[in-house]
Amino acid sequence: GNFHEALNLASLWKLPVVYIIENNLYGMSVPLSCSTCTPAIATRGAAYNIPFDIVDGMDVLAVRAAVAKAIEHARSGAGPYLLEFQTYRWYGHSRSDPRAYRTKEEEADWKARDPIPNFAALLVAEGVATEEEIDAIEAKVKGEIQVATDFALSSSLPPAEELELYVYAPSSWTDADVAREKALRERVRNGGPGVKKARYWEALRDAMREEMLRDPQVFLMGEDIGLYGGAYGATRGLFEEFGKERVRDTPISEATIGGSAVGAAMCGMRPVAEIMYVDFTPLAMDQVANQGAKNRYMFGGKTKVPMVIRTEGGAGRGIAAHHSQSLEALWTHFPGIYVVMPSTPYDAKGLLKAAIRDDNPVMFIEH
């Protein structure tokens, strides 16, 4: 699934990622023994050449040492590291969870290993802190939690007028820009001197090339976009010009393509990710629709996700049941993402350049 795709890509690209698994022994109610065929989850890292450690998550010093080791590894350029902390979930999955799937004796055994009082006792025993200092720290933390709780409970609900306030990042286009674009469109449609003729894929390639030259944060990623030049030739020559760091071939892993694009965009880059057919975009539904499209809204407008998913759909050539659907309407149901489906080379180039510069996720469907 997505976890395996992510591990594979991180190891393949030697990304400085530390993956942390908090193994609390249960899903919602199903125990690990009934849902996972191995006693530990971190062993999956071996399949992707990722070093891993399985750590007692109730031991503060063991956790600290493991994290320090993993971070040093990632920062050295050696690639990702996988940590599994074996811990416990004190409470049920939700307020309505009666915890009937485990015994009180099991809960008591794990409660005896509670790292907070145990570590505090260790600090006192080793002479690192006094009981008074521990009590002061505990009181300070409880006070901070109480302040946050009081703030949440006393805050009024946002007014209905703000319902759509943070759905989309604001556009930088002015009325003058729109008027100029309208005049230019008419001149191009009428043809004549100075109007370049280009095929659809050439217009797309020119748009990406120009934006990559203009902004070093723009990069391409996706299936067969490198030396092959893309399934329909739209990235032809860009690998040779910009190199493998900015034109990145990926495995056939649509979920990870979408998720990586969301993450890169949140960190200030402007990814242009290619998913070969719109039929395959539902494989990235969680990453693009649940994370990318909702991110700005959920964080009160404090983030932006400037990313483009390029894909192919619509009529033209019938390529069987799994490669020929028209799913543009599906993506229009998600607030926070723009859907673009240009019909002419002129529209394709202009809209792709605008999509790359926009601070919102864009599903860009070509034909």
Place the predicted regions along the sequence by residue.
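Glycine-rich ThDP/TPP pyrophosphate-binding loop and its adjacent helix/strand module
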Residues: G1-V147, F151-S154, T332-H367
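Alpha-helical protein-protein interaction elements
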Residues: V18-I20, P80-L82, H93, R102, ...
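Thiamine diphosphate
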Residues: E5, L12, E164-E366
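Flexible loop/turn segments at secondary-structure boundaries
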Residues: Y26-S29, L61-A62, R89-H93, P159, ...
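Hydrophobic alpha-helical membrane-spanning segments
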Residues: L153-E161
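Short linear sequence motifs
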Residues: S94, T103, A112, E161, ...
